[in-house]
């Protein structure tokens, strides 16, 4: 077992907040400055699409004052209809967030546009994008399989909408809200199961929490959005990998600084604490409407197997599920997951990806349409095995963490895919080794 110790102030800036800060900046009137913008491939795809739509985007590297160099982004816009017709398809690469949220804006623009991506993104379902926008009067076409390319003939005459989210999805919620900003009147989104709420917070939208647990989000259309600065905290989804590293390591202690602690993003911490993980939260404060703090993680030799099935919990940990599954499998030999069909429509079929790789390492697994069970812990295979990453950053990083902590000799089919969300992933692991 390896030992990992140290303080980390170089976690990637939050991916979700970076996307939204740039997109909201493109809709605002004036100059939007974003400090600590993410350098991940997905967020850079959002900036590239905005540039291709005629938005002024400048990005520089500047000193942060604590020895770090951070990305500073400046966006200039004249408001909701500042976009120009693109001369070619808009390349979103691997970023589903870019494709889905930009579709909401482009549905309201008076021109034709086409959103495309890499081979992985072109297989992901986009009907959930098209359905609410068509209800608002948008002309949208998809492939026969309901996937990209997303071809949009936009209109400035979008109708208001009262939309019940059929699945908990922050991306779908956000694209409906972004489209509704352009509609003449008031729209409402009804959210039975909570998903991350950065869009509502950053736009200052009115929210109503009903006694039955359902949230209503109110959007008043065609109101000017004033430009304002954003400071992006560290990504809690990236923090999950370093937490797993510390929990699996021997005599390890890692402090993760300035992490976003938005309750809709850190449900995985509750899951781990309930299982006996040695996790602490310190120095909690508010920055830009988001709670931020430090996470302290220590080795844990008595972690209970993770069993996740509650719909709300699954929705709250959807991005962290691959890491939680691999962590539980390596630490306890067991894991159980249900009600997570959504995992099959991510960058890869993450249920199949996790199960196939665990089975390759000798774990006994059983797969279901909505989840899987890990039923036995083998002696970790210390001969080199190849992990198939499926072009999915979270699959690559989850198994890399387990290999580092367990001292297993695993080779990733694609190390570079980690750069989608965590460019300094491998360098950071090396810096924590003792």
From Swiss-Prot:
State the GO CC annotations.
Answer: cytoplasm
Chain residues that bind phosphoenolpyruvate: 15, 96, 124, 171, 350, 394
Q: Name one GO molecular function term.
A: 3-phosphoshikimate 1-carboxyvinyltransferase activity
Involved pathway(s): Metabolic intermediate biosynthesis; chorismate biosynthesis; chorismate from D-erythrose 4-phosphate and phosphoenolpyruvate: step 6/7
The catalysed reaction is:
3-phosphoshikimate + phosphoenolpyruvate = 5-O-(1-carboxyvinyl)-3-phosphoshikimate + phosphate
Residues reported in the UniProt entry to bind 3-phosphoshikimate = 15-16, 20, 169, 171, 195, 319, 346
Q: Which InterPro entries match?
A: Enolpyruvate_Tfrase_dom, Enolpyruvate_Tfrase_sf, EPSP_synthase, EPSP_synthase_CS, RNA3'P_cycl/enolpyr_Trfase_a/b
Q: What is its EC number?
A: 2.5.1.19
Which GO biological process annotations does it have? amino acid biosynthetic process; aromatic amino acid family biosynthetic process; chorismate biosynthetic process
Tell me the keywords, alphabetical order: Amino-acid biosynthesis, Aromatic amino acid biosynthesis, Cytoplasm, Transferase
Location(s), subcellular: Cytoplasm
Catalytic-site annotation from UniProt: 319 (proton acceptor)
Gene3D superfamilies attached to this UniProt entry: Enolpyruvate transferase domain (3.65.10.10)
Q: How does it assemble?
A: Monomer.
NCBIfam families, alphabetically? Answer: aroA
Job of this protein: Catalyzes the transfer of the enolpyruvyl moiety of phosphoenolpyruvate (PEP) to the 5-hydroxyl of shikimate-3-phosphate (S3P) to produce enolpyruvyl shikimate-3-phosphate and inorganic phosphate.
**Family that this chain belongs to:** Belongs to the EPSP synthase family.
Query: What PANTHER family does this protein map onto?
Result: AROM/DEHYDROQUINATE SYNTHASE, PENTAFUNCTIONAL AROM POLYPEPTIDE
This one is known as: 3-phosphoshikimate 1-carboxyvinyltransferase
* Phylogenetic classification of the source organism: Bacteria, Pseudomonadati, Chlorobiota, Chlorobiia, Chlorobiales
């Amino acid at each position: 077992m390896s030992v990992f110790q140290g303080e980390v102030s170089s976690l990637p800036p939050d991916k979700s907040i970076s996307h939204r800060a740039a997109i909201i900046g493109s809709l605002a009137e004036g100059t939007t400055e974003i400090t600590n913008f993410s350098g991940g491939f997905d967020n850079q795809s959002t900036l590239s699409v905005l540039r291709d739509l005629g938005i002024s985007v400048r990005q520089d590297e500047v000193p942060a004052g604590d020895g770090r160099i951070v990305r500073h982004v400046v966006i200039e816009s004249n408001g909701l209809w500042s976009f120009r017709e693109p001369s070619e398809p808009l390349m979103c690469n691997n970023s589903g967030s870019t494709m889905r949220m930009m579709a909401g804006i482009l549905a309201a623009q008076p021109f034709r546009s086409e959103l495309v991506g890499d081979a992985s993104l072109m297989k992901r379902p986009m009907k959930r994008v098209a359905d609410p926008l068509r209800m608002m009067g948008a002309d949208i076409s998809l492939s026969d399989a309901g996937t990209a390319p997303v071809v949009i003939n936009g209109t400035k005459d979008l109708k208001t909408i009262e939309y019940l989210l059929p699945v908990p999805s922050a991306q779908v919620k956000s694209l409906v809200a972004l489209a509704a900003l352009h509609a003449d009147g008031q729209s409402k989104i009804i959210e039975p199961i909570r998903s991350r709420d950065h869009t509502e917070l950053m736009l200052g939208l009115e929210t109503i929490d009903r006694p039955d647990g359902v949230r209503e989000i109110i959007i008043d259309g065609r109101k000017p959005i004033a430009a304002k600065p954003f400071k992006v905290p560290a990504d809690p989804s990236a923090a999950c990998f370093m937490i797993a590293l510390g929990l699996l390591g021997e005599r390890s202690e890692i402090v993760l600084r300035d992490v976003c602690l938005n309750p809709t993003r850190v449900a995985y911490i509750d899951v781990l604490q309930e299982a006996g993980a040695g996790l602490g939260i310190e120095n909690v404060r508010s920055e830009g409407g988001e709670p931020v703090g430090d996470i302290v993680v220590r080795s844990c030799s008595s972690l209970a197997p993770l069993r996740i099935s509650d719909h709300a919990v699954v929705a709250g940990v959807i991005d962290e599920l691959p890491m939680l599954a691999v962590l539980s499998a390596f630490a306890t030999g067991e894991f159980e997951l249900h009600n997570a069909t959504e995992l099959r429509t991510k960058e890869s079929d993450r249920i199949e990806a996790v199960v196939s790789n665990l089975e390759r390492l000798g774990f006994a697994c059983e797969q279901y349409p909505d989840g899987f069970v890990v039923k036995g812990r083998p002696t970790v295979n210390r001969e080199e095995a190849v992990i198939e990453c499926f072009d999915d950053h979270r699959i690559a990083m989850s198994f890399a963490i387990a290999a580092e902590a367990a001292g297993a000799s695993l080779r990733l089919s694609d190390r570079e895919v980690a750069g989608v969300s965590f460019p300094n992933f491998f360098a950071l692991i090396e810096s924590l080794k003792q």
